[in-house]
Amino acid sequence: MEHNGSASNAGKIHQNRLSSVTEDEDQDAALTIVTVLDRVASVVDSVQASQKRIEERHREMGNAIKSVQIDLLKLSQSHSNTGYVVNKLFEKTRKVSAHIKDVKARVEKQQVRVTKVETKQEEIMKKNKFRVVIFQEDIPCPASLSVVKDRSLPENQEEAEEVFDPPIELSSDEEYYVEESRSARLRKSGKEHIDHIKKAFSRENMQKTRQTLDKKVSGIRTRIVTPERRERLRQSGERLRQSGERLRQSGERFKKSISSAAPSKEAFKIRSLRKAKDPKAEGQEVDRGMGVDIISGSLALGPIHEFHSDEFSETEKEVTKGGYSPQEGGDPPTPEPLKVTFKPQVRVEDDESLLLELKQSS
């Protein structure tokens, strides 16, 4: 029993030792994990800081690139401007060179003229015979002229050139004043007058004059005829126009009625054939044709309003009385055609009433 108790105590002690060892190991593992995590966090922080620095550097580089691009654009613009200016300078230099050539040609011509003048002056000086006439504005010109003869020449030719040959400036900027002649003045004045006339009769001036005239005429119209009177005149004109249209329409209706009541061409043809066959039946055919034409005209004009019963009764009686008697030859008798005539009667109540009569030709 004692042995068992000691064994159990030893087991408990061993278990306690093992549990203490496992607890120490767990604590050490936790510490190592914490230290590792701290190191990882520090590494991550350093990485994030480096990434932020890299991003800032990238931004700085992008800004620098943009500034460089802007500078390049400015340089290109300035280069294009300088090229344009250089082209203008080249053109100006070409013009200046051409002008210089012209000036050189003029100077050469002047030199030729100067040499001619010098030769003439030398000839005159050799002859020593020339006249000098001086005109002044206020003082009248003398009648007699002074003539210099046998003038003593100076000893040196250089002194003579200085006295009689003043220095001539041959600069290209020198301007010469030439007096205009009377014809040139007249031409200028004529051109100025023509220009003034053209300006006076130009389109703009003519339009302005038209506008002013229209305004004046409108003012005069308003003074002469007031707007109320003008409106009344317009209304009266419209009324007259409407009455004229009504009259025209009534005339057209009257023409249509007359044309519809006129005898047709077929009636005339039948009448002419019957006249050729039987000249005695001329009167009957005339009445018959008139009746047929009036029937057609009455249909065009309008419906018949009233029929007289007495006339219808008389016609019926005549038709019943008149029988068809057989002829000797045994042939059936040919019935005579009915004669239809219309007699227009004008009444107070109905203006367009027509009277129908049916008569049998005997």
Curated annotation (Swiss-Prot):
Q: Does the keyword Cell membrane apply?
A: yes
- UniProt keyword list: Activator, Cell membrane, Coiled coil, Cytoplasm, Developmental protein, Differentiation, Membrane, Myogenesis, Phosphoprotein, Transcription, Transcription regulation
Which InterPro entries does the record match to this protein?
Answer: Cavin_fam
- Enumerate composition-biased segments (Basic and acidic residues): 230-255, 275-289, 305-320
Task: Spell out which residues are annotated as carrying Phosphotyrosine.
Answer: Y324
Compartment(s) where it occurs, according to its Swiss-Prot or TrEMBL record: Cytoplasm, Myofibril, Sarcomere; Cytoplasm; Cytoplasm, Cytosol; Membrane, Caveola
Q: Which residues carry this modification: Phosphoserine?
A: S152, S171, S172, S353
Q: Which GO terms describe its biological process?
A: cardiac myofibril assembly; muscle organ development; positive regulation of transcription by RNA polymerase II; Rho protein signal transduction
An annotated GO cellular component: sarcoplasm
Concerning what turns on (or off) its expression, the entry says: Up-regulated in response to cardiac hypertrophy.
Which residue ranges are recorded for the region named Disordered?
1-24, 230-289, 305-346
Tell me the superkingdom of the source.
Eukaryota
- Annotated tissue distribution: Abundantly expressed in cardiac and skeletal muscle (at protein level). Weaker expression in aorta and lung. In heart, expressed in cardiomyocytes and vascular smooth muscle cells but not in other surrounding cells including vascular endothelial cells.
Purpose: Modulates the morphology of formed caveolae in cardiomyocytes, but is not required for caveolar formation. Facilitates the recruitment of MAPK1/3 to caveolae within cardiomyocytes and regulates alpha-1 adrenergic receptor-induced hypertrophic responses in cardiomyocytes through MAPK1/3 activation. Contributes to proper membrane localization and stabilization of caveolin-3 (CAV3) in cardiomyocytes. Induces RHOA activation and activates NPPA transcription and myofibrillar organization through the Rho/ROCK signaling pathway.
Query: What domain notes does the record hold?
Result: The coiled coil domain (residues 44-77) is essential for membrane-targeting in cardiomyocytes.
Q: What does the annotation say about its assembly with partners? A: Component of the CAVIN complex composed of CAVIN1, CAVIN2, CAVIN3 and CAVIN4. Interacts with CAVIN1. Interacts with CAVIN2; this augments the transactivation of NPPA. Interacts with CAV3, ADRA1A, ADRA1B, MAPK1 and MAPK3.
* Similarity-based family: Belongs to the CAVIN family.
Q: Which PANTHER family match?
A: CAVEOLAE-ASSOCIATED PROTEIN 4, CAVIN
What is the name attached to this protein's record? Answer: Caveolae-associated protein 4
Primary gene name: Cavin4
